[in-house]
A protein has these predicted regions:
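Active-site beta->alpha loop and helix N-cap motifs at the rims of alpha/beta catalytic domains
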Residues: 3-146
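Catalytic alpha/beta core domains of metabolic enzymes, predominantly
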Residues: 131-132, 143-173
């Protein structure tokens, strides 16, 4: 099915428009979307506060609140794949744990960016996230990460436990 990568609506002062987010989530659900992907790269995550009790936590709370209400009234299961990407492996693991604790169906984990890790470090990044026990989706977007995962590594990554899939944004498969 189709899943919406949710944007994070912002107010003019740069704060998150939580009412706008709630309206957007409700709209997506009422219009029949099959699943939601909050806190991915489309969601302005690098600009959000991520500390406990933060903007990110409030976004997670709103998304799951609306999804649970919709599931209760519609009888339909709505998968939520929570963005858990970071170029810092420790942070990515913590985001995967947060996704698991929130009740997400999977975590979307972007290829580590900026530091240009070796193939082995990329593999270890995804392996560390996989150990959380939540299904993970590898997010391969070389246009943003400046890393193109080579075919030999793409063949190796599926050996990891809890790998659910890959979101491919290379433009050529």
């Amino acid at each position: 099915g189709a899943l919406t990568a949710l944007i994070t609506p912002m107010n003019a002062d740069g704060t998150v428009d939580f009412d706008g987010l709630r309206k957007n989530v409700k709209f997506q659900l009422e219009e029949g979307i099959d699943g939601l992907v909050p806190l991915g790269t489309t969601a302005e995550t690098p600009t959000l506060d991520e500390k406990a009790g933060s903007e990110e936590d409030k976004i997670i709370e709103i998304v799951f609140d609306e999804v649970r209400k919709f599931e209760k009234t519609s009888g339909k299961k709505i998968p939520v794949i929570l963005g858990a990407g970071s170029n810092n492996t420790k942070d990515a693991v913590a985001y995967c744990e947060r996704a698991k604790n929130a009740g997400a169906d999977a975590a979307l984990v972007v290829t580590p960016y900026y530091n240009k890790p070796t193939k082995e470090r990329i593999y270890q990044h995804f392996a560390a996230c996989s150990k959380v026990g939540l299904p993970i989706i590898v997010y391969h977007i070389p246009g943003r990460t400046v890393l193109n995962i080579q075919t030999d590594l793409l063949v190796r990554i599926p050996e990891l436990p809890h790998l659910a899939g890959e979101k491919e944004e290379r433009g050529s498969v």
